[in-house]
């Protein structure tokens, strides 16, 4: 189940707000300019879907977002625990960074934890299948796929070059709860 936990960015020990209610999550995130919606990822995928399979099955959803926001490129990120780059990628994504464009993800299977550092708070968003998340350009954040990742998400970009991170060097991600599933 999707969830949102909010912390002060100066106290990782005590959440100041938590919910698993999609409407409450959407309101909290919309209030800070973050788009969160529950979509329907109902298409059946194979056990280890290729990028081509995922893109073909969800072309309608991609087309909707492209028409709405003018995205120039999209791809699929799919991670399983047997991926030889799993630990390396987890470490990379756990480093706080920003993008000069919105970061848009539609989760079609599995889960991951997006952590936003915004307005003196940390917003930890557990995204699962059916979740659409759009993080505004310039928002400091990190992503935790967990020690045993299992997720597939469609990523959409304003930039035809795709995912380009600008790391902040802040070690704040080291002190907040991680995804342990």
UniProtKB/Swiss-Prot annotation:
Top-rank lineage group of the source organism: Bacteria
Q: Pfam families, per this entry?
A: ARD
**Which cysteines does the record link by disulfide bonds?**
none
Cofactor(s) this protein cannot do without: Fe(2+); Ni(2+)
Q: Which reactions are catalysed by this chain?
A: 1,2-dihydroxy-5-(methylsulfanyl)pent-1-en-3-one + O2 = 3-(methylsulfanyl)propanoate + CO + formate + 2 H(+); 1,2-dihydroxy-5-(methylsulfanyl)pent-1-en-3-one + O2 = 4-methylsulfanyl-2-oxobutanoate + formate + 2 H(+)
Query: Site feature Important to generate the dianion: at which residues?
Result: 105
The entry marks the following residues as binding Ni(2+), namely 97, 99, 103, 141
**A single BP term in Gene Ontology:** L-methionine salvage from S-adenosylmethionine
CDD domains linked: cupin_ARD
EC identifiers of the protein: 1.13.11.54, 1.13.11.53
Amino acids binding Fe(2+):
97, 99, 103, 141
Question: In this UniProt entry, which residues are annotated as the site May play a role in transmitting local conformational changes?
Answer: 102
What top-tier enzyme class does this entry carry? oxidoreductase
The function of this protein is: Catalyzes 2 different reactions between oxygen and the acireductone 1,2-dihydroxy-3-keto-5-methylthiopentene (DHK-MTPene) depending upon the metal bound in the active site. Fe-containing acireductone dioxygenase (Fe-ARD) produces formate and 2-keto-4-methylthiobutyrate (KMTB), the alpha-ketoacid precursor of methionine in the methionine recycle pathway. Ni-containing acireductone dioxygenase (Ni-ARD) produces methylthiopropionate, carbon monoxide and formate, and does not lie on the methionine recycle pathway.
Question: Which PANTHER family does this entry report, sorted A to Z?
Answer: ACIREDUCTONE DIOXYGENASE (PTHR23418:SF0)
What name goes with this protein? Acireductone dioxygenase 2
Gene name of the record: mtnD2
């Amino acid at each position: 189940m999707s969830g949102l936990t909010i912390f002060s960015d100066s106290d990782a020990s005590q959440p100041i707000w938590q919910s698993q209610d999609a409407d409450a999550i959407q309101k909290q995130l919309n209030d800070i300019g973050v788009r969160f919606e529950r979509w329907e990822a109902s298409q059946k995928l194979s056990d280890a879907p290729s990028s081509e399979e995922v893109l073909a099955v969800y072309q309608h959803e991609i087309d909707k977002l492209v028409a709405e926001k003018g995205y120039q490129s999209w791809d699929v990120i799919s991670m399983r625990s047997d991926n030889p780059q799993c630990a390396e990628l987890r470490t990379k994504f756990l480093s706080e960074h920003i993008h000069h464009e919105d970061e848009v993800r539609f989760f079609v299977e599995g889960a991951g934890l997006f952590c936003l550092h915004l307005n003196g708070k940390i917003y930890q968003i557990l995204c699962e299948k059916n979740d659409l998340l759009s993080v505004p350009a310039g928002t400091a954040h990190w992503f935790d796929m967990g020690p045993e990742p299992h997720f597939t998400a469609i990523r959409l970009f304003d930039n035809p070059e795709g995912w380009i991170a600008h790391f902040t060097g802040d070690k704040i991600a080291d002190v907040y709860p991680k995804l342990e599933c």
